[in-house]
Amino acid sequence: MLSDFFNNLASFFSNIFSLFEGKKQTRILMIGLDGAGKSTLLYKLKLGDIVSTVPTIGFNVETIEYKNLSMTVWDVGGQYKIRALWKHYYHGTNAIIFVVDSTDRERMDEVKEEIDTLLIQEELKGIQILIFANKQDMNNAMNTSEIVDSLNLNSIKDRKWYVQPCSAIKSPHGIYEGFDWVANSLNNK
């Protein structure tokens, strides 16, 4: 498949570049439902600023140098019809970042279904999951414990997981803390 070819080619060049930079190469899959703020969060970390985004049809890919890691982050669209394509991005993934719109209580069952689907994928077996509870700056945002309960995350026993509250628009602090968790858990593998 053409997407596999490009994924393998990107991985090859990332590995070549890492030999010169001395940074550990990692592949991060950033997914979540549409409108959760994935692209905004990615570009806030990459550029340090808010950029105007449109719904992602397909994917965005960026390399982020963070601590001792060179992270290739694949931000894949979250519209319902696109989610069936997520499986094409699983190969070689070292960590998953699932971005949740903390204000969208009505879609938490849908989020849970998607996370449950990820957990049973053989290619993602044991892969850690960071859940960014985005849009914490909004008055009606669910807090971390509400997200954990709503998604039944305490039942996950076969991998590391962590929920990090953040606001991609208001403050980078939660974003950095989340990526710290990813970096630390990848380095301690």
Curated annotation (Swiss-Prot):
Q: Which PANTHER family match?
A: ADP RIBOSYLATION FACTOR-RELATED (PTHR11711)
**Could you tell me which cysteines form disulfide bridges?**
none
The protein's gene is named arrH
Q: What does this protein do?
A: GTP-binding protein that may be involved in protein trafficking. May modulate vesicle budding and uncoating within the Golgi apparatus.
Query: Where does it reside?
Result: Golgi apparatus
Q: Does GTP-binding appear among the keywords?
A: yes
Taken from the UniProt entry, a GO cellular component term is: cytoplasm
Identify one Pfam family in the record: Arf
Q: Which GO terms describe its biological process?
A: intracellular protein transport; vesicle-mediated transport
Q: Which GO terms describe its molecular function?
A: GTP binding; GTPase activity
* Protein source organism: Dictyostelium discoideum (Social amoeba)
Record keywords, A-Z: ER-Golgi transport, Golgi apparatus, GTP-binding, Nucleotide-binding, Protein transport, Transport
Q: Which CDD domains match?
A: Arf_Arl (cd00878)
The residue stretches assigned to a coiled coil in this entry are: none
Q: What's the protein called, per UniProt?
A: ADP-ribosylation factor H
Q: Where does GTP bind?
A: 34-40, 75-79, 134-137
> What family is this protein classified in?
Belongs to the small GTPase superfamily. Arf family.
